Design a protein with these regions (language model features):
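N-lobe entry segment of adenylate-forming
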Residues: 1-58, 63, 87, 108
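Conserved AMP-binding/adenylate-forming
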Residues: 35-37, 52-98, 211-214
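Conserved AMP-binding A3 loop
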Residues: 38-42, 160-188, 232-235
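Conserved structural elements of the adenylate-forming
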Residues: 45-53, 175-201, 206, 212
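Structural core segment of the AMP-binding/adenylate-forming
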Residues: 82, 86-153
Length: 235
């Protein structure tokens, strides 16, 4: 890729599936099996397509509907992030460590069509199930579905992500972000790398680097946006 992609559609169909299908997208450890799983970009893309099928077949008129993610960091979190966006839904990453009062306030504002969760109790599981039980679905539900044969670009300036602030000065505010908002930040980072071309061999993957952030954080959302040129780094 000669430049950072500007749409999620291109990131998946061009980056993951055509240019770098055999490169490593993720490596993650599963405590139950004591194993490290390696996922290639082509495999990640197939799981994203499965999520598109899942959401579009279970949410009536899925376009513009809110899908909340309530989970710890995981491979499934990233799959559902990209899948919800490509299904035309509005992604709502949520801080699972917030109090029920804070969380319920955000959910009332959002009016979600689905809440994807890892099923763990972060302190509000009982209240969550009582209030939104019919909307709760496991994070790995996409695995039961076939990959979508076709993907379609989303509106570049349409609402794509609704991200809540930390609420340090009061109740959390929902920040409305479009595809243009998110990918413009990635293009800035790409431009900085291009200026360092005389110091970095841009034909090779960058050295491994680490970011310790929850996936509901804006910085982590940007970091996990597909950027196959440094895809040999462990995610």
């Amino acid at each position: 890729m000669e430049k950072f992609v500007s749409t999620m559609y291109d990131a998946i169909t061009q980056g993951m599936e055509k240019e770098f299908p055999e490169r490593v997208a993720f490596r993650y450890y599963t405590e139950e099996t004591d194993m490290v799983t390696t996922v290639l970009f082509k495999e990640l893309a197939q799981d994203v397509r499965r999520t598109v099928t899942y959401l579009q077949s279970t949410i009536p008129d899925a376009k513009g509907k809110k899908v909340c993610l309530l989970s710890k960091n995981s491979y499934e979190y990233v799959v559902n992030t990209f899948g919800a966006i490509m299904a035309g839904c509005v992604l709502v990453p949520m801080n699972q460590r917030k109090s029920w009062a804070e969380m319920s306030h955000e959910l009332e504002l959002v009016e979600p069509a689905a809440i994807l969760t890892d099923g763990e109790d972060y302190g509000s599981k009982e209240q969550l199930e009582a209030a939104y039980g019919s909307l709760l679905h496991p994070m790995d539900e996409f695995r039961r579905y076939e990959p979508a044969a076709e993907l379609h670009p989303i509106g570049h300036d349409d609402l794509m992500v609704l991200m809540f602030t930390s609420g340090t000065t009061g109740l959390s505010k929902g920040v409305m972000m479009s595809e243009r908002n998110l990918f413009s930040a990635g293009q800035v980072l790409w431009a900085i790398s291009a200026q360092l071309a005389d110091k970095i061999d841009l034909t090779k993957p960058l050295p491994g680097h680490y970011m310790v952030l929850p996936m509901f954080h804006l910085g982590c959302l940007l970091y996990t946006s597909p950027s196959p040129r440094d895809s040999t780094s462990s995610r």
